[in-house]
């Protein structure tokens, strides 16, 4: 596989392979000396056209722990702010000898364009494109679930996952639905009708507008809360929900809803969180919460992705 652009690029064996390699990478990070020589002499460029804390620093840490040289590119402090196109930026990076380009862009499909337009010969990793996809987030979420819900090996066959919130604007939700289904999990999306995308009925998952019923009757193994992405909501199209208070009442995870969950259920969030809106402080900081763990797991998963793209072999996927 030359690129990782979508969770759909991975079949079951390829996805499990990434998770297995991530487990091996995580083991190396428990040692006193964490750095590996695997990608010495390779150059990884973090090309971020949107703000990011967790994803950008996670990819930077992953590449550096594999001994790659890292170039961090921010659109705000570059010629992009002067009108330079994605093509010209990519050609500049190609001239610098980039072996991999990790790209986050506000336009859906930008990483695919970068990978297939002939502007770069390096591997392209989608670190989030618009409201489309975020495959490495889905991989780290699946990795986190596997560590808690299985023996830490194999797939997620039979696991029940409820994803709650702003699905309409969430690239995380899309990638998770695709990957979790590939790994054998059953996924239910819960959101108000205004925050579900057109065509969601064709996604490989169930949908519901009733969070209490989904938690009480679905007996989920994992509940993933999604951030309400107010910055992507066009006010000219009207309100997506009556008020923040009403949204929290209907779709927020707090003390009462935590009590509906089976004892083993984990609580997840891809971050950043709106505490007090989609998730209460009590839920976010509870013993069930894996939110901080997810951030740490992201480094191991992204180490695995970079290793398999640049030094290993990942079967299937985008050629």
Curated annotation (Swiss-Prot):
Coiled-coil spans in chain: none
EC number in record: 2.1.3.2
Pathway: Pyrimidine metabolism; UMP biosynthesis via de novo pathway; (S)-dihydroorotate from bicarbonate: step 2/3
A GO molecular-function descriptor: amino acid binding
Catalytic activity of the protein: carbamoyl phosphate + L-aspartate = N-carbamoyl-L-aspartate + phosphate + H(+)
Protein function: Catalyzes the condensation of carbamoyl phosphate and aspartate to form carbamoyl aspartate and inorganic phosphate, the committed step in the de novo pyrimidine nucleotide biosynthesis pathway.
Protein name: Aspartate carbamoyltransferase catalytic subunit
Species of origin: Kineococcus radiotolerans (strain ATCC BAA-149 / DSM 14245 / SRS30216)
Gene responsible for this protein: pyrB
